[in-house]
């Protein structure tokens, strides 16, 4: 049996003048990345640039959706309904699917970000909403979680 380790990293979290991370330096050393979808980081230019960078390094592209929290970088727990979570995920993941497709590739996975990630680890119903929404968008998308 062949063994494989996926080295994964959050990327594309800069937002216009607010620079976050060293994506260009890290990308050659990873096998998959989670690209911010615009709600905690990741403006349109950064998203496109980061997807292109991943593709040129043969790195699998994933969506990194969050609660709508630019000010708190997606780390603040916000009161949201399950329907709101579903809508946020549909919007952000679909955006990454569209851009990735436009650039000639396919979205590989989803890893939710920050507070949403933490909320899902503590609330089974939120976790179920996330899993069902991702499956409804594309049953072939992988869901990345804590190891």
Spans of features found by a protein language model:
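Hydrophobic faces of well-ordered beta-strands that scaffold small-molecule active sites
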Residues: 5-9, 33-35, 61-65, 108-112, ...
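Acidic (Asp/Glu)-rich catalytic clusters
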Residues: 24-28, 49-62, 101-104
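Catalytic beta/alpha-barrel core
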Residues: 35-40, 119-120, 137-147
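N-terminal basic/disordered segments at the start of proteins
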Residues: 5-19
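Glycine/small-residue-rich loop that forms an oxyanion/phosphate-binding "nest" at active or ligand-binding sites
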Residues: 70-104, 109
């Amino acid at each position: 049996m062949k063994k494989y380790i996926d080295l994964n990293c959050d990327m594309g979290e800069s937002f216009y003048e607010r620079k976050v991370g060293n994506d260009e330096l890290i990308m050659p050393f990873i096998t998959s990345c989670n690209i911010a979808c615009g709600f905690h980081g990741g403006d349109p230019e950064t998203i496109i640039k980061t997807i292109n960078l991943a593709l040129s390094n043969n790195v699998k592209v994933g969506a990194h959706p969050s609660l709508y929290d630019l000010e708190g970088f997606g780390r603040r727990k916000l009161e949201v309904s399950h329907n709101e979570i579903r809508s946020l995920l549909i919007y952000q993941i679909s955006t990454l699917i569209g851009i990735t497709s436009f650039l000639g590739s396919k979205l590989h996975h989803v890893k939710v970000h920050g507070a949403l990630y933490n909320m899902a680890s503590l609330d089974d119903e939120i976790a179920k909403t996330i899993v069902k929404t991702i499956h409804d968008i594309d049953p072939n998308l992988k869901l990345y979680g804590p190891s």
